[in-house]
From Swiss-Prot:
This is Transcription elongation factor SPT6. Histone H3-H4 chaperone that plays a role in maintenance of chromatin structure during RNA polymerase II transcription elongation thereby repressing transcription initiation from cryptic promoters. Mediates the reassembly of nucleosomes onto the promoters of at least a selected set of genes during repression; the nucleosome reassembly is essential for transcriptional repression. Essential for viability. Residues 24-35, 45-62, 90-99, 141-167 have a biased composition (Acidic residues). Residues 1239-1349 form the SH2 domain. Residues 66-81 have a biased composition (Basic residues). It comes from Cryptococcus neoformans var. neoformans serotype D (strain B-3501A). Residues 14-23, 100-110, 168-190 have a biased composition (Basic and acidic residues).
Length: 1506
């Protein structure tokens, strides 16, 4: 990074000048702005004498002030030198604070907002609202000198005689060397700073020697900070030295510190995942009354609770059968407990949102609160299970959002009442805010819109009074409706006799009686004729206008809209219509085939299914259209219910006529307003529902993987951590050595060894010696190819030989036995003896190891380990502690695949949120020993998942314990200020403190200074009294026996008693719990049971045994093949490796071995094959069908017999058959496809003599080009007719442009035209001319843009812009990327300020032409000219809009191209000295005779494929 403001770099923004003039402060002299010079000088020179003389300096000119400053420096020069000698080996106070903060020895200073360091070009106060003023600065500053006017503010000190002749660069280098020398001296004498040498080494390893940030400590002229700059130095903050992005990544922002210090769970303070790179901090608002919230939350908790307590769902539909339990026992409904259930939900909401207790704490320590004891404690009913508690928390958040939105609406109503006096609207306050608007967040928002609709003029007046900005949200069509409703036509509306409020109230009450409707005494048209005139020329128009107003009023009512949504959710039908492209692309092998002909599938059937997100993805790809409908009879029933509330019960001609008009209003309301609105809502609702389902299934899969004990071989005790030897050969290439990494039982790397090949005798011997020396409990193996199977075989041979050596007995030899049966018996006996000495060899799930091996963290932790060695280390760690391995991944856990096909379709933030919940459940189930966790950096990864904590609070806890030392007991958490009361209650039970139980000396005095045996258990401190009482009863001790002892002494005595299980088992917990409940202590049955379990086996690991993958899972992990791809009956393609007489050895593309026996080469009716090597040759490709997969041996047996091939299948759909696929539609589509093929078969296929010609469709052409380079193309037939061809060329990875080429002057139907025209303007003589001068010329412009420093890949561009403006406040930035949505286009994106401050990334399209770029009407030959064109067009747009430099389009949150349907400033000439191309001064030069018209549209760019 350059330290010269005028230098250009990729990181700097450029300046947009809205008025076309240069206003760079570096070009102004100090005399132009003496106040600015004085302000900057004050930032550097802080001598008291100068401060006293500031008033006089104001009257002096700049030259006088500079001379006085120089004299002052000379006067202090000698004193400064003497002081510098004393400070040679010392660190500044600020440096010490930064070091101590990073070591965790002191609390960091509160972070403030980012400030400019002294000497910068301007201050925050001088800068207006951030604009794009500086976006193009680097393009212009490259023309400037390296020096700038900042050098004028501070004169250089006079140097010593010896240094008079040195250059500026030499002087700076000398200064840096002196500073480095001082740092080295301080490092060599750590006692001067209170930092030991090992800590110094660690600090230097992490933060470097500080030279990276020397620029932050240098003055404007490059000089180091001296005496006059000490004040500025003392104000130096973290933001002044470190990049804001790094501060954010380390969670050191002000918001992060606030979260860490607040006495609330971290996950309650952040809306999304605490692991997210972009956390959304929640506001601390008062939660609504839990009793009211419970009435909304309780009916929505789960299928189980709806079935049990609300009599919903068909009888017998719960429990749902599973694979493990296909015929579950029936569960009896308990509707009599509905009120008790709502009380339990209310209690849960109160604990979560008022008391701030997290779900794991409630589940483990407050489960009794959510259950009811019956039959005198002999049975209980559990109201809320663990996952249901999490759902209550989610629903509670939603209810709070609804409540807050309604409160905002209520406040607006209060302002209206205050303005209008005694106005009352009972329907709004009670019917809407009290009922309808509480139903959903959509209804809450509609309540605000209803208020704005009915009180538009009042709200407008209120906003004017409060000086609201014109940018405030504007309701659509309001002006037109207000005009209509203020006119005479409202009298005709009243004549309809329909009160929208009463209709809505009646419509909600199915069994209620509609309000009576009065009829006028005239016919509708007769009455409407009275309102004709200038506004309405006929009674029909007047009646239509009145109907329109009535429809609008009814359609705005939240109650009616909510009824429509509920109706669509219950009775909606979904139909899929494939597009023309979808009909050809989605074949029977496509993932979308199972819903290609989906017809009238009920909306409720999409619950608990990921199918809808696949449908949305297919629609996004342009393959299908999703339609929502409702059966005619159901829709008629809904409409009739609405008509019932609007019609009159009178009889007669007039009443019938008015009822007809009212019926028409209701039909219009339903079909034109309510159903379209409900269809849009249900689409997003089903998306959310499917995403939640996928995220939850991923969480469940994660918990299955991590909720297991460490691997334990026979003979190991429960809870013991194994020593592990991990081996891998990577991809199995000949260049890949076998890496072995040994971890001891404490997780330390004991050795790392490399073997060339374990089949070699020398390497095998070395491997056996390693086993003998390190004695691992288990050997784990992994790899990335089928070659891992060969490594496994070689390792098994070596392990068996090692076991034979330990046994000291050779295996039996067959020659020594008279018969084979005797030999087999002896061999079985020998193997049984050998089993005790065999070290287990297993595969483990390598998902965490794959991510760890390529992570930056792995490279920092083990820089000497090769990539495969880090992978082996990851395998070993997983075997020792799967939970810790997944916790260590942090946010990267979302990269692990838990649900194939589905997981990638949901947002990463949502997935991360649910996966974090899974880790929280798992870590809290097991608990953590806090002292060992803090001492081991690897174990620390689990601490954030303890209830109440998170990454920020965990860092604070680690820092505090490192500062104060290991904890003695749980009271230390609060005594040392590590936890507040709320966090202590959440976390205490999950954090144990290990002590030597036998050596404890417990005394009654000073319990806070002694260990407590209960702290070794997962018993919560609030239950210590129960535990102590139960131990006392189990030991048959009276109260007097323990009166003068430490309260937990009885616990220690019992825990040391080998018969404690029997003694505790004699306690009658049911009676004890029932008596406690009668005494008002509440239900404690579960708590008492957990206490007993912990006292018998404290911190015992209750998780299932370590899960070893199945053979098929191993094959999938190593090769990617599944039972669905190489299962029995599937067709495969194999390559012959070796053929012998009896069989053929082949290999599949995935590396799996395939064996073809001679008997399976040909059918019986064919000529017999006597020798396979006569039929098959090496490297020959053969088609076969799998007849027997053998996953344990990494091979399949195949057959090439024609009869077997006819029965084989090419593909097995990953999804089950959809019962709602229409067979008639499928048959019709297949018939149409067959007819099309028949027509093609009877038609002569066109052949063009050119190497790029291929008979492919658009999709096949893309697949063909996938492995090619940019600019490569395919020429193919066009579906538009015989006089056209199509050219598909590769723009970028996964981006292809399809160009329509018209043939002119064709000799005949099958010959190529003599003129090839693209979009009617680009003419080419032949295909080579078209490729070179059109395709290749366009591709070169893409290559050129990618060489520019502002180009970024499309998926990185947004992050690049956001990170830049965040790291450089006040600056703006722009960048380019390929537009994957519009092949042949570029994106020009720019951002003026951080998104958190309202910045919006805006995008302008840039068309890439053969040899040029087109931005609007400007056609430019190069990237520099493109940037200039952008500057000029943007400046013109600013001038047009008159926003005084503010970014256009920022208020509407839209890209400028959406304003008025046009790209800003693209519809007019680009101003540049009267020329077409900016900054060139002349017309765009001709780019070739073949492409004369660059200003016109390139065909098929971003358009349809041909």
């Amino acid at each position: 990074m350059s330290d010269r403001p005028g230098s250009a770099s990729e990181g700097e923004g450029d300046e947009i000048r809205p008025y076309g003039e240069d206003r760079d402060s570096s070009e102004e002299s100090e005399d132009d702005d003496p106040e600015e010079a004085k302000r900057i000088a004050e930032g550097f020179i802080v001598d008291e004498d100068e401060e006293d003389g500031e008033g006089e300096d104001d009257e002096e000119d700049e030259e006088t002030r500079r001379r006085r400053r120089k004299e002052e420096k000379r006067r202090r020069k000698k004193e400064r030198r003497m002081r510098r000698e004393r400070e040679e080996a010392e660190l500044s106070e600020d440096e010490l604070e930064l070091i101590e903060e990073n070591r965790g020895l002191r609390e960091g200073r509160p972070l403030k907002r980012l400030r400019r360091r002294s000497g910068s070009e301007g201050s925050e106060n001088d800068r207006a609202v951030p604009t794009l003023q500086d976006m193009f600065r680097d393009d212009e500053d490259r023309m400037e000198d390296d020096d700038d006017d900042l050098m004028d503010f501070i004169e250089e000190d006079e140097e010593d005689e010896a240094n008079q002749g040195e250059t500026e660069e030499q002087r700076r280098e000398r200064k840096r060397a002196e500073k480095l020398k001082r740092r080295e001296q301080a490092r060599s004498r750590p006692e001067l700073t209170g930092v030991d040498r090992s800590s110094w080494d660690e600090i230097f390893a992490v933060f470097g020697d500080g030279q990276d940030y020397d620029w932050a400590l240098e003055g404007e002229d490059g000089m180091d900070l001296d005496e006059e700059e000490e004040a500025a130095k003392k104000d130096l903050r973290l933001e002044d030295v470190f990049d804001p992005a790094e501060i954010k990544a380390r969670r050191l922002q002000d918001e992060d510190k606030a979260v860490a210090n607040a006495d609330r769970p971290e996950r309650h303070q952040i809306v999304n995942s605490t692991l997210s790179d972009n956390p959304v901090f929640a506001t601390d608002t008062l939660y609504p009354p839990p009793d009211f919230a419970a009435k909304w939350v309780a009916p929505k908790v789960s299928f189980r609770t709806q079935y049990l307590f609300y009599n919903q769902h068909p009888e017998g539909s719960y429990p749902i059968p599973t694979i493990d339990n296909p015929q579950p026992y029936p569960v009896y409904r308990r509707p009599d407990l509905e009120i008790e259930f709502e009380k339990a939900v209310s209690t849960a909401l109160n604990m979560m949102f008022v008391q701030h207790l997290e779900v794991p704490y409630l589940w483990h320590y407050k489960r009794d609160v959510f259950s009811l004891l019956e039959n005198q404690g002999q049975s209980s009913v559990l109201f809320l299970e663990r996952d249901e508690l999490w759902q209550v928390y989610v629903l509670g958040q939603r209810y709070r959002a609804i409540h807050e939105r309604n409160e905002q609406t209520r406040q607006q109503w209060g302002k209206i009442k205050a303005r209008k006096g005694d106005i009352e609207d009972e329907y709004f306050t009670k019917g809407l805010l009290g009922k309808a608007c509480v139903a959903s967040i959509e209804a809450a928002g509609e309540g605000d819109e209803w208020l704005a609709y009915h009180y538009a003029s009042d709200i407008k007046a209120i906003k004017e009074e409060e000086a609201f900005d014109e940018v405030s949200k504007k309701l659509p069509e309001r002006a037109e409706r207000e005009d209509i409703r203020r006119g005479r036509i409202m009298k005709l509306v009243e004549a309809f006799g329909i009160d929208a409020n009463k209709v809505a109230s009646s419509f909600q009450d199915v069994h209620g009686q509609p309000a009576p409707v009065m009829n006028p005494d005239k016919m509708p048209l007769e009455l409407a004729d009275e309102f004709t005139g200038a506004a309405y020329s006929s009674p029909e128009q007047a009646l239509s206008a009145a109907s329109f107003v009535l429809v609008q009023e009814l359609s705005k009512d939240p109650a009616i809209r909510q009824q429509a949504r509920d109706f669509m959710d219950t009775c909606g039908l979904v139909t899929v219509n494939a597009t023309d492209r979808g009909m050809s692309v989605i074949d029977q092998y496509h993932l979308y085939y199972n819903f290609k002909f989906l017809t009238n599938k009920p909306v409720p059937d999409f619950r608990d299914s990921p199918q809808f997100v696949h449908m949305l993805k297919a629609e996004e790809e342009g393959l299908i259209n999703i339609a929502f409908d409702i059966r005619e009879d159901m829709l008629a029933s809904f409409t009739d219910a609405l008509i019932r509330c609007c019609r009159s019960n009178d009889y007669g001609e007039i009443a019938s006529a008015w009822n007809e008009v009212r019926m028409e209003v209701c039909n219009t309301l339903v079909k034109k307003h309510l159903m379209p609105m409900a269809s849009k809502w249900i689409k997003e609702h089903l998306r959310t529902q499917a995403e939640e389902y996928i995220a939850e299934r991923c969480r469940e899969e994660l918990e299955l993987r991590v909720n297991v004990r460490p691997y334990a071989s026979s003979g190991m005790e429960q809870g013991e951590t194994p020593s592990v030897l991990a081996i891998t050969n990577g991809k199995g290439d000949i260049r890949d050595a076998v890496m072995a990494v040994m971890l001891d039982d404490e997780g330390n790397v004991r050795t790392q060894t490399k073997f060339d090949n374990l089949r070699d005798e020398e390497d095998k011997t070395m491997f056996i010696e390693l086993l003998e020396k390190r004695k691992p409990k288990v050997v784990v193996i992994g790899g990335f190819s089928a070659q891992t199977a060969r490594l496994k075989d070689a390792a098994l041979v070596a392990i068996r030989q090692h076991a034979i050596e330990l046994l000291g007995q050779n295996p039996p030899v067959s020659d020594a036995y008279p018969d084979h049966e005797g030999f087999q018996y002896a061999m079985a006996e020998y193997d049984e003896k050998l089993k005790a000495h065999l070290i287990p060899l297993i595969f483990v799930n390598d998902a965490t190891a794959r991510l760890y091996m390529s992570s930056e963290e792995a490279e920092k932790e083990h820089p000497n380990l090769p990539l495969n060695g880090r992978y082996a280390l990851g395998l070993a760690r997983y075997a020792q502690n799967p939970l810790n391995a997944y916790c260590k991944l942090g946010k990267h856990i979302a990269s692990v695949t838990f649900m194939e096909h589905h997981q990638k379709l949901i947002p990463q933030e949502k997935l991360l949120y649910h996966l974090e919940r899974g880790l929280v459940n798992s870590v809290c189930f097991m608990g953590i020993e806090i002292n060992s966790c803090v001492a081991d950096p690897y174990q620390r990864a689990m601490l954030p998942y303890i209830a109440g904590l998170g990454p920020r609070k965990a860092d604070a806890v680690i820092y505090g314990i490192q500062k104060h030392g290991a904890l003695i007991n749980r009271m230390a958490f609060t005594d040392l200020g590590l936890f507040g009361p709320t966090i202590f209650e959440n976390t205490a039970g999950f954090l144990t403190i290990e002590s030597d139980l036998k050596d404890m000396m417990l005394e009654a005095e000073n319990p806070q200074e002694q260990p407590d045996p209960l702290d070794m258990t997962r018993i919560h401190p609030e239950n210590y009294e129960f535990a102590q009482k139960m131990c006392q009863d189990a030991l048959d001790l009276d109260v007097e026996d323990v009166a003068d002892r430490h309260k937990s002494e009885v616990v220690q005595t019992l825990m040391l008693d080998d018969k404690r299980g029997k003694k505790l088992g004699e306690l009658n917990l049911d009676d004890f719990a029932f008596n406690l409940q009668r005494q008002g202590e509440g239900n404690k049955r579960h708590t008492l049971g957990e206490i007993v379990s912990e006292l018998i086996r404290y911190r015992s690991d209750r998780r299932p045994a370590f899960y070893v993958p199945t053979d098929w899972e191993i094959v999938t992990m190593v090769t990617g093949e599944t039972e669905r791809t190489v299962g029995r009956g599937l067709k495969v393609t194999a390559t012959v490796r070796k053929a012998i007489s009896a069989r053929v050895f082949c290999q599949l593309e995935s590396g799996l071995d395939a064996v073809l026996e001679r008997d399976y080469v040909a059918d019986e009716d064919q000529a017999p094959v006597t020798s396979c090597d006569e039929v098959f040759k090496p490297r020959q490709a053969i088609k076969g069908v799998v007849i027997m997969p053998e996953p344990a041996r990494f091979q399949v047996r195949i057959s090439t017999r024609p009869s077997d091939l006819r029965q084989g299948v090419d593909f097995v759909q990953p999804f089950k058959d959809e019962e709602y696929n229409s067979k008639d539609r499928r048959d019709a589509a297949e018939a149409a496809t067959a007819a099309k093929k028949q027509r093609r078969a009877g038609k002569v296929q066109r052949i063009v003599n050119h190497p790029n010609w291929h008979v492919l469709n658009s999709g096949q052409a893309e697949q063909f080009l996938a492995s090619q380079h940019r600019g490569d193309c395919v020429i193919r037939p066009s579906s538009k007719g015989p006089d056209r061809i199509a050219v598909t060329w590769k723009v970028d990875e996964d981006v292809y442009q399809h160009i329509d080429v018209q043939e002119i002057d064709k000799p005949n139907e099958y010959s190529l035209g003599r003129i090839l025209m693209v979009s009617g303007q680009y003419r080419y003589s032949d295909l080579d001319d078209l490729i070179i001068n059109h395709v290749k010329a366009t591709a070169r412009k893409f290559d050129e843009i990618q060489m520019h420093e502002k180009y970024k890949p499309e998926h990185e561009l947004d992050a690049f812009l956001k990170n830049y403006v965040q790291a450089h406040p006040g600056r703006s930035i722009y960048g380019f990327s390929v537009d994957s949505d519009r092949p042949g286009y570029l994106k020009l994106c720019f951002l003026s300020k951080p998104t958190k401050d309202g910045g919006v990334i805006q995008t302008w399209p840039v068309r890439v032409l053969p040899g040029a770029y087109k931005l609007g009407n400007a056609i430019v030959p190069g990237v520099t000219e493109l940037s200039n064109a952008f500057k000029m067009q943007y400046s013109e747009k600013l001038a047009e809009q008159g926003h005084q430099g503010k970014t256009p389009g920022i208020y509407l949150g839209k890209t400028p191209m959406h304003l008025g349907g046009r790209t800003p400033a693209l519809g007019s000439r680009t101003p540049a000295m009267g020329s077409r191309t900016p900054a060139l001064g002349s017309r765009t030069p001709a780019l070739g005779s073949r492409t004369p018209a660059l200003g016109s549209r390139t065909p098929a760019q971003g358009g349809p494929r041909y």
